[in-house]
């Protein structure tokens, strides 16, 4: 019997509105090192096939800066990481052309609930509809 569980954690705030050119590389370096250490430990314990990691942000960033950074925007990014993930880039980047922006924001073209749906159905083997409140486009990225 395979037991699946879910855990949440968070990293220091990416809620920056200034100094992003200097701050974001440091934040992403911290995140990258933490993920690498976590998966290195999983591999040492022969457990990396049993774990996927979903990274996401609850908000995106605006296209145009405010002078030294960017404010909250509509579209964001997410990552699914693990030995059971078919690597690659999934989805399309939204247009950053001024005429395609909505009130200065990128227009999301993929609902992140599709990632939750995929994880709940394909990883946990459960019905996702009551969890994500519907059905959404998904990317079949698990092996």
Features from the language model and the residues they span:
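Short, small-residue-biased leader/transition segments that mark boundaries at the very start
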Residues: 1-3
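Active-site regions of oxyanion-processing enzymes, predominantly non-cytosolic
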Residues: 5-8
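Feature marks hydrolase-like catalytic cores characterized by long aromatic- and Gly/Pro-rich stretches
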Residues: 13-143
